[in-house]
């Protein structure tokens, strides 16, 4: 895919060594600044997975850049009260840090798989994570309030994909009600981000097809 597109893979400062998470708005400011310095005037596609969907949604509703398509893979669209987020923060911190302490040994307890292809990324995330950064991120993420508005035109080019076996599938109905003009493919029999993890080439080809043909490709596991 990088042979056809200028691919940018931003990572939250929460998982970067020596960086300080300030707020969602600051994260967006950093991404916007990078795009401006690179001379980017249009985005063919924005892709976000899991909790990255929360930050991506904030980006979509604030950026002035034209966006061709959007693809959410197993988006974490939870709406959680501030009290619950406060309680879950230390537990989440220990879970992520354990990935580093155990050299990836606890990954299978957190995710459905512990493939060697993804383990290094989770270990690095656990190593770099600080409690302060995580607390700040959770304090302004997954908030218990209505989803931000997206224009009908952008909704028509936005794909909210979920695996039928993943826990995040439970958010699908609420997202469909918030964005009725969007597309909601279901990957039958698939778990959280399974297609992206197990067949990264196929996943990339799917994204390219959406960007170029304005539709999902014919995939045998898409629920009819």
Give the role of each language-model region.
Residues 47-52, 56:
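Gly/Ala-rich beta-loop-alpha elbow adjacent to hydrolase catalytic centers
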Residues 82-83, 99-152:
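Conserved alpha/beta-hydrolase catalytic His-Asp/Glu region
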Residues 1-8:
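Short amphipathic alpha-helix adjacent to the substrate-entry channel of hydrolases
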Residues 136-177:
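Conserved serine/cysteine hydrolase catalytic core
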Residues 8-45:
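Active-site loop/oxyanion-hole signature of alpha/beta-hydrolase fold enzymes
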Residues 61-97:
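Flexible "cap/lid" loop of the alpha/beta hydrolase fold
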Residues 190-202:
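Catalytic histidine-centered segment of alpha/beta-hydrolase-like enzymes
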Residues 179-193:
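Catalytic histidine neighborhood in serine/cysteine hydrolases
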